[in-house]
């Protein structure tokens, strides 16, 4: 039997090969508390205390460093942005009314702590083993490997096996 062809391969060439290394997360995923809805970021304690209108102190876009929320106010926030320090609740844009720089929650809206927040390391934490050696690499595995920060992996070609049956004992099917 020929030896398996093994070595480092680019992710684009890794599908259907046999993984020869553990794939370990280089960082937390997500790497920060990530907002999952456009809207406003508030402190849930302000909501519990009865506040339903919040002056908008800033806007935070995805990719910008996290801002710091002032008590009693809100930060307009976009999907994918880092959760501002001091905020622990996101109210979707569909549930607020904005006038004169103040966001007001719609009547009857119930805000929950940590709602619409994808928590840091909730998918996996730095150091977690994501894939074990010995598995056939699927297209989904390629996505996992890429999300772990790797552009190439140690992998082997799958062996090709053929069965050749011979002998007088063999009879045609049927």
Task: Locate each region found by the language model.
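Short, low-complexity N-terminal leaders and the immediately following helix N-cap/first helix
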Residues: 1-51, 101, 119
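Short, glycine/charged-enriched hinge/interface segments at domain edges or termini
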Residues: 40-174
